[in-house]
Amino acid sequence: MSKIGMSCKDCTFNVKENKEQTSCQLGILETIKTKSSKCEIVEGDYQFDRICNFRTTEEKTKEEILQEKYIRFHFIIVDTNIDKTLSILDSIEDLVTEDNRVCVATTENFKALSLKIGNKPNYFITNSFKDKKTVFEYMDDTFNKIKNGYTIVLHEDDKISKEYLDKVNEFINIKMNRLALIENSPFVVNNIIFKMLKGNKDLSFKDKLGELQQEQEIDSMIFTWEDIDEDTGL
């Protein structure tokens, strides 16, 4: 029989009884069954058409794999008020590791931001000479500095916490939702899809996603923070 997509065969976390899979040590098999359009046992192991980021044949503990596959978050800060921008930089300091990138987009505060950021290798500043840009235009300016993963876009009074990063990680990795955009502030975007659709060039990223979903007849990848709260319950 041809393979549906992914298989739990030989996965470290596959739980079997009498040579047939019954569960998953990570507790996500029920989610796989619910979210997959195809999910069935083939030769003793579940096969399905969703992507499980945790599948491995290496000897790892549950805690190790959950930490290893935790979503990589980057940050874009749109600077239109230097005091508020500096406050945002302070507020995310504990959330930023060497694997995260932080990019600040500004039109007039390059010097003050440079003094604040110093020589941190994963912090970047983009300086634009065009006034009255939209937040979306600032996003496009900065994305060449951002690596794959997901990006949180922060502007003026926006706030983000470890709790909400955990919720997004749960929503994607554990609940297996296909997330391309959280549309209410602070915005969260899937970096690969954002770059593939060329951001907001010619048409907003949200509208491009709508067209893509309609063309491919797939479920919406656009969510709100309320959706995240409801589905994760964290």
Task: Tell me what each language-model feature is.
Residues 56-91:
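N-proximal low-complexity "stem/linker" segments adjacent to membrane-targeting elements
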Residues 1-66:
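Cysteine-centered metal-binding/redox modules
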Residues 129-146:
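Glycine-rich, basic loop-to-helix element that forms the pyrophosphate-binding segment
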Residues 151:
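Short aromatic/hydrophobic "clamp" motif used to bind/position activated sugar donors
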Residues 165-180:
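Conserved donor-nucleotide/metal-binding helix-loop-beta segment in metal-dependent transferases, i.e.
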Residues 90-99:
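Short, acidic, metal-binding catalytic loop of nucleotide-sugar glycosyltransferases
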Residues 99-109, 127-128:
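Short beta-strand/loop segment that forms part of the nucleotide-sugar
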Residues 155-159:
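The conserved acidic donor/metal-binding loop of glycosyltransferases
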